[in-house]
Amino acid sequence: MSILKKPDLSDAQLRAKLAKGMGHNMYGEPAWPNDLLYTFPVVILGTITCCIGLALMEPSAIGEAANPFATPLEILPEWYFYPTFNLLRVIPNKLLGVLSMASVPLGLIFVPFIENRNRYQNPWRRPIATTVFLVGTVVTIWLGIGATKSIQDAISLGLF
């Protein structure tokens, strides 16, 4: 069940507005009640059902029991801390490592000011921001992979 409101094109004022491109978003299918009352609950319940179904069909393994008297050879953080862990591990001076991590958000703050002359929405027409994003992504993935390697291969990844 949906409600469809069609424009009254016999109205001269409405036709004049539409000719100028000043039409309202009042035509077609309204958000209330169609989307908010019917579509959104179906999507939300479907997502919850999929999550519960996947959790029941494939529960995650608990793993081996913790032994407080046996320490593993190398302790690794959670996967999302791999790049910062590797950065702190390969930079010999710890203060320099912390400052290098603090310089990342400080550098990102200055990107809009560097590129303030460019008013385009398309990211490929904003070369500085696009380059910073792509280089940052590659460096983060590189450091994340390097955290799982030995300290000798942490930067080169054993490739060269």
UniProtKB/Swiss-Prot annotation:
Q: What is this protein called?
A: Cytochrome b6-f complex subunit 4
Q: Which HAMAP family match?
A: Cytb6_f_subIV
Q: Which gene encodes it?
A: petD
UniProt keywords, alphabetically: Chloroplast, Electron transport, Membrane, Photosynthesis, Plastid, Thylakoid, Transmembrane, Transmembrane helix, Transport
Q: How does it sit in the membrane?
A: Multi-pass membrane protein
Q: Where in the cell is it found?
A: Plastid, Chloroplast thylakoid membrane
User: Which PROSITE patterns does this chain map to?
Assistant: CYTB_CTER
Per the record, the similarity remark reads: Belongs to the cytochrome b family. PetD subfamily.
Q: Which InterPro entries does this chain map to?
A: Cyt_b/b6_C, Cyt_b/b6_C_sf, Cyt_b6/f_cplx_suIV, Cytochrome_b_C_euk/bac
Question: Where does the UniProt entry say this protein principally localizes?
Answer: plastid
Subunit description: The 4 large subunits of the cytochrome b6-f complex are cytochrome b6, subunit IV (17 kDa polypeptide, petD), cytochrome f and the Rieske protein, while the 4 small subunits are petG, petL, petM and petN. The complex functions as a dimer.
CC annotations in GO: chloroplast thylakoid membrane
Task: Tell me one GO biological process term.
Answer: photosynthetic electron transport chain
UniProt key word Transport: yes
Q: Name one GO molecular function term.
A: electron transporter, transferring electrons within cytochrome b6/f complex of photosystem II activity
What is the stated purpose of this protein? Answer: Component of the cytochrome b6-f complex, which mediates electron transfer between photosystem II (PSII) and photosystem I (PSI), cyclic electron flow around PSI, and state transitions.
- Pfam families, A to Z: Cytochrom_B_C
Species for this entry? Cyanidioschyzon merolae (strain NIES-3377 / 10D) (Unicellular red alga)
- List the transmembrane segments: 36-56, 95-115, 127-147
